[in-house]
Protein backbone atom coordinates (compact mmCIF):
# COMPACT_ATOMS: atom_id res chain seq x y z
CA UNK A 1 0.00 0.00 0.00
CA UNK A 2 2.97 2.31 0.50
CA UNK A 3 6.00 3.36 -1.54
CA UNK A 4 8.78 1.00 -0.43
CA UNK A 5 12.33 1.00 -1.75
CA UNK A 6 15.59 -0.75 -1.04
CA UNK A 7 18.50 1.31 0.24
CA UNK A 8 21.44 2.26 -1.93
CA UNK A 9 24.42 -0.14 -1.57
CA UNK A 10 25.86 2.10 1.16
CA UNK A 11 22.61 1.88 3.18
CA UNK A 12 21.43 5.42 2.49
CA UNK A 13 17.94 6.32 1.18
CA UNK A 14 17.13 5.33 -2.40
CA UNK A 15 17.29 8.89 -3.74
CA UNK A 16 17.72 12.55 -2.80
CA UNK A 17 14.05 13.42 -2.33
CA UNK A 18 13.36 15.78 0.54
CA UNK A 19 10.36 16.04 2.84
CA UNK A 20 8.26 19.19 2.71
CA UNK A 21 9.37 19.76 6.31
CA UNK A 22 13.08 19.28 5.54
CA UNK A 23 15.33 16.26 5.66
CA UNK A 24 14.98 13.09 3.68
CA UNK A 25 11.55 12.05 2.40
CA UNK A 26 12.50 8.47 3.29
CA UNK A 27 12.30 6.71 6.66
CA UNK A 28 13.86 3.35 7.46
CA UNK A 29 11.65 0.43 8.51
CA UNK A 30 13.79 -2.14 10.30
CA UNK A 31 11.22 -4.92 10.03
CA UNK A 32 11.19 -4.78 6.23
CA UNK A 33 14.75 -3.54 5.88
CA UNK A 34 13.48 -1.00 3.37
CA UNK A 35 12.74 2.70 3.24
CA UNK A 36 9.23 4.09 2.89
CA UNK A 37 8.34 7.42 1.31
CA UNK A 38 6.82 10.24 3.36
CA UNK A 39 6.54 13.65 1.70
CA UNK A 40 5.34 15.14 4.98
CA UNK A 41 5.79 13.57 8.44
CA UNK A 42 7.44 10.16 8.86
CA UNK A 43 4.23 9.13 10.65
CA UNK A 44 2.33 9.81 7.38
CA UNK A 45 3.66 7.35 4.78
CA UNK A 46 2.64 8.07 1.20
CA UNK A 47 0.21 5.69 -0.47
CA UNK A 48 1.48 3.98 -3.62
CA UNK A 49 -1.10 5.18 -6.13
CA UNK A 50 0.67 3.30 -8.91
CA UNK A 51 -0.88 0.13 -7.42
CA UNK A 52 -4.34 -0.79 -8.78
CA UNK A 53 -5.45 -2.14 -5.36
CA UNK A 54 -4.77 1.26 -3.77
CA UNK A 55 -6.64 3.04 -6.55
CA UNK A 56 -9.60 0.66 -6.17
CA UNK A 57 -9.72 1.17 -2.40
CA UNK A 58 -9.76 4.95 -2.78
CA UNK A 59 -12.53 4.72 -5.38
CA UNK A 60 -14.51 2.55 -2.93
CA UNK A 61 -14.17 5.27 -0.29
CA UNK A 62 -15.38 7.90 -2.78
CA UNK A 63 -18.35 5.73 -3.79
CA UNK A 64 -19.23 5.18 -0.12
CA UNK A 65 -19.54 8.92 0.47
CA UNK A 66 -21.24 9.64 -2.85
CA UNK A 67 -23.96 7.11 -1.97
CA UNK A 68 -24.49 9.08 1.22
CA UNK A 69 -25.11 12.27 -0.72
CA UNK A 70 -21.94 14.31 -0.40
CA UNK A 71 -21.59 16.98 -3.07
CA UNK A 72 -17.87 16.64 -3.68
CA UNK A 73 -14.41 16.10 -2.28
CA UNK A 74 -11.46 18.28 -1.40
CA UNK A 75 -8.21 16.68 -2.54
CA UNK A 76 -5.38 18.15 -0.49
CA UNK A 77 -1.70 18.12 -1.55
CA UNK A 78 -2.69 16.43 -4.80
CA UNK A 79 0.70 17.17 -6.37
CA UNK A 80 2.16 14.56 -3.99
CA UNK A 81 -0.18 11.69 -4.93
CA UNK A 82 2.15 10.12 -7.49
CA UNK A 83 5.92 9.76 -7.29
CA UNK A 84 8.31 8.94 -10.08
CA UNK A 85 7.83 5.21 -10.60
CA UNK A 86 11.60 4.75 -11.05
CA UNK A 87 12.50 6.77 -7.92
CA UNK A 88 15.14 8.80 -9.76
CA UNK A 89 17.04 11.59 -8.00
CA UNK A 90 15.59 15.06 -8.41
CA UNK A 91 17.87 17.24 -10.54
CA UNK A 92 19.33 20.35 -8.89
CA UNK A 93 17.53 23.55 -9.83
CA UNK A 94 19.93 26.29 -10.99
CA UNK A 95 20.44 28.89 -8.25
CA UNK A 96 19.09 31.70 -10.43
CA UNK A 97 15.73 29.89 -10.71
CA UNK A 98 15.30 29.16 -7.00
CA UNK A 99 12.81 31.08 -4.91
CA UNK A 100 10.77 30.39 -1.80
CA UNK A 101 7.75 29.19 -3.74
CA UNK A 102 9.58 26.80 -6.09
CA UNK A 103 12.71 25.64 -4.30
CA UNK A 104 13.28 27.07 -0.84
CA UNK A 105 16.70 26.83 0.75
CA UNK A 106 15.72 23.57 2.49
CA UNK A 107 14.95 21.97 -0.88
CA UNK A 108 17.39 22.81 -3.69
CA UNK A 109 15.70 20.45 -6.17
CA UNK A 110 12.95 21.12 -8.65
CA UNK A 111 10.32 18.82 -7.16
CA UNK A 112 9.83 15.82 -9.43
CA UNK A 113 10.49 17.77 -12.61
CA UNK A 114 11.03 14.48 -14.45
CA UNK A 115 7.54 13.04 -13.92
Language model: regions and residue ranges:
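Alpha-amylase-like alpha-glycosidases and glucanotransferases acting on alpha-linked glucans and related
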Residues: 1-115
Amino acid sequence: WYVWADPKPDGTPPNNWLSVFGGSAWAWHGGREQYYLHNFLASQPDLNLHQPAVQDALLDVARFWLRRGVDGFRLDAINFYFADRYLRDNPPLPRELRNDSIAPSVNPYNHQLHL
